[in-house]
Every structure is written in C-alpha cells, then in structure tokens.
Curated annotation (Swiss-Prot):
GO terms for cellular component: virion component. Its main location: virion. Residues 86-105 have a biased composition (Basic and acidic residues). The gene is UL22A. This is Glycoprotein UL22A.
Amino acid sequence: MARRLWILSLLAVTLTVALAAPSQKSKRSVTVEQPSTSTNSDGNTTPSKNVTLSQGGSTTDGDEDYSGGDYDVLITDTDGGNHQQPQEKTDEHKGEHTKENEKTQ
C-alpha cells in the first residue's frame, strides 16, 4: 500500500511539473537589408529602414506573442528604437484589390 502511494505521488509530481513548464514555440524571422536611401515617384529621397519579418514563437523580453499566419513587421529606426506594427488589411485595401482583379478579368 505504501509503495502504491509513493508511485501515485511521484506520478502527480511529474504531471504537475510537466504541465507547469512553459511551451517552447519556434520563432522564425527574416531581416531585410535595404539601401540607405530610397527615392519615391516625386523624386524625394528618404532614408530607408531595416525590416524584420517574424512569425510566431515565444519572446523572452515580455513583448506580446503574435502567433498565427500573419507576419508582423519590426521596423528598426536609425536611433535604435523598435516599433512593432502588425500587418492588417483594411476594408479599403481589400476593396482596391477586388477592383484591380475585376479590371484584369
């Protein structure tokens, strides 16, 4: 009887530890290096920024975890500040693509 109690308590401790451990997700990211300046259609020259695309994964710095199929864009300024901008399609953006697709058909 004591042996069964010992085995059950060992099993309970093992399950508790296994469930309490944080799950590890893989994090994928790609950094896109861009030229130092870019010129738009008006001829204006603007400094470019490095863009990092990342998907899923857990973070160790306390930032939110944007898991899922959409990519997040991390823009690194020249001053070293990071600004995370989730990519979201607006209704207006979707409407433009629908109109373009109708024109091509």
